[in-house]
Each structure stands twice: as structure tokens, then as C-alpha cells.
Amino acid sequence: METHSSGRGLAAALACCALITLVLLANHPAGGGHSLTEVISAEARDRTADALVHGGFVITLTALIVCLVSVARTLGIARPIVLTGLVSFCVGSGMLMLSMILDGLAVPAIATRFIGITDPSALLPARTALMLCGVLIGILMPFGLLLQAATMLSWSIAIAARRGLPLAAAIYGILATALIAGGLLLAPAAMSGHLLLGAIVLLALWYGALALLVGTRAIAHR
């Protein structure tokens, strides 16, 4: 009875993480501006919203790591394919957390320090700092999502031999991984923003699928 209750609790936690991820994504500040002063103004204006959304992502990713450790134990954490997926998710989440901190806290803080300044020479440090943050975010976020997609792939392979819901979830995981990897690695740079958002949505749906599998006890280790 205790095991069943803990399974339902884990399923509820995964479902909440999936839902919160989608809600945070829907409320992500749009930013805006073309010139440096416009970008600084927009980032400073949205500082509170940025902190809430990106801070929420960091907390959610932390909760997901805890949840996926429990799922890995259910799948059989000693299995190489399961352990590899867990490590990949943890590393990917760490990269995403750093990206979120830069995007949601560092960039708005930098912008706030330079709000109202119009002298190009005085804005040079802001341009340099914002460019550095942008480069780091552009590296950390795609790689973090790819590592999380690798977890989805490895765990999908781990449950692909089963019938019913596990097989359906495995097929989804494999297809979603192909879409994420293909999009992030092959698509034009101009589409990168939309592809990153799409990857987060696909991963959130996978968390929901894991919640269903755990809640129905369809992936207990055999």
C-alpha cells in the first residue's frame, strides 16, 4: 500500500512539473527592441517577470531531477541505459539552470544598471556583457535540451519492449527526440528561438507521459 501511495505521489509530482513547465513557458516575457537602448529598456522593464519565470524553471528542474531519480529506481537504476539517461538529464538540467540564471537574472540586472543611458561609449560595457550572456545562453540551452532529449531516448529504448502504454510512450519519446535533435542541430539559426520553445513543450509532454506510466504502475522494473 505504501509503495502504491508513493507511486501516486511521484506521478502527481511529475504531472505538476509538466503543467508548471507549460505555464511558465506561456508566461515567458517576450522581450523586444532592436537597438541596444531598446533591448536594455525591455529587459529592465520585464525584470520581475523574468525572475519569476526563470526562477520557476530552476525550481521545476530541481524537482524533476528528484522525480527522475525515483523513476530511474523504478526502471532499474543499475541498468546502464537507465543510469546513462539519468546522468544525462542531471547534466542537461544543470546547463539549463545556468542558462535560466543568465537569461532571467543576470541579463535584466545588467540592463537595469544601464537604463536611461544613451551615450554609445558609456553603453559599451553593457553591449559586451549582454553579448557574452547571449553567447553563453545560446550554447547552454540547446545543449541542455539535447541532453534531456537523450534521456528521453534512452529511457524510451529501455521500455520499448513492453506493450500498451509503455510502448506508446516509447514511440513518442523516440519521435520527439528525433524532432528535437533534428531541429536544434539542422534548422536555420533564425528558427532557433521557436525550436527551443518547441523542445521544451515536447519534453513537458514526456514528463506527463512518465506521470501516467508511474501512476498506472506500467513501468515497474522486471
Describe these PLM feature segments:
Residues 1-222:
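Hydrophobic, aromatic-enriched alpha-helical segments typical of multi-pass transmembrane helices
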